[in-house]
């Protein structure tokens, strides 16, 4: 099971197996740096494979369309290219990758395993690589967007001096570069690189929690001041409202992705193994469901994006009618 392969890849493997992976490209259990997928017991997870495969097959097209709309409206409208929206577009691009690459390869993996009791190394590598890039970008960007909101609340008007769209765009590109690099370093089959990758995820998740707690304190203070009839500037109120919107998006991300991270931490640091491989499939699927849910939360909470999409959809429909 690739779920098991994904999250147990942090275990150390003997040098003999590592050196012969390339020569045995298509033998069960031998696929470069990925560990044995335990195909000999695939029948134990056949039902879960089918259910999670169907769930992801249904949600994948929606994730593609919804996140593509988010990326399109933000990238095509300068008025929407604020620092926070650029980071939201980065998150949407990550979710778009899930719909285009990760979920289809997951579905192929599950159905092939059920049909043949074996999945080729190419499919396993495609799924694993896409998964780790997506997961790393998501957690890193969550921290970045949380930091951006905290700076907006702390520095007020000076915020625009420190945080500019161009700088944020460069940061988003750097986030993608670093996570692609970390994923590529897995090919070294070195436990140190894998540990660094996992430690990075954990670090950014912890940073996100700390920052969101600080933001919550600021928002609570702001609401108390309103009750005491000490109104703040309209700019301040707008930043607080946007911080609440971003916090909602972050909360949804964490709820759906935390189970996967906990399983990974359990393997790496506690060396625990969950007997039912089905659990891995469900935690992965929960993370993928978030890629379809997140654009809905974004559209619901961010009025400017919701309005832009409402304007774009009729135009796209008219264009499609003209083509026909």
Q: Where are each of the predicted segments found?
A:
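Extracellular N-terminal segment of 7TM GPCRs
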Residues: 1-65
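Extracellular TM2-ECL1-early TM3 structural module of rhodopsin-like
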Residues: 45-60, 84-144
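Membrane-lumen (extracellular) interface motif
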Residues: 115, 184-197, 267-278
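Class A GPCR helix-loop hinge within the 7TM core
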Residues: 135-171
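Membrane-water interface of transmembrane alpha-helices
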Residues: 140-147, 210-226
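Extracellular-loop-to-transmembrane junctions of the mid-late helices
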Residues: 178-217
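Intracellular effector-coupling site of seven-transmembrane GPCRs
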Residues: 217-262
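Seventh transmembrane helix
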Residues: 262-265, 281-324
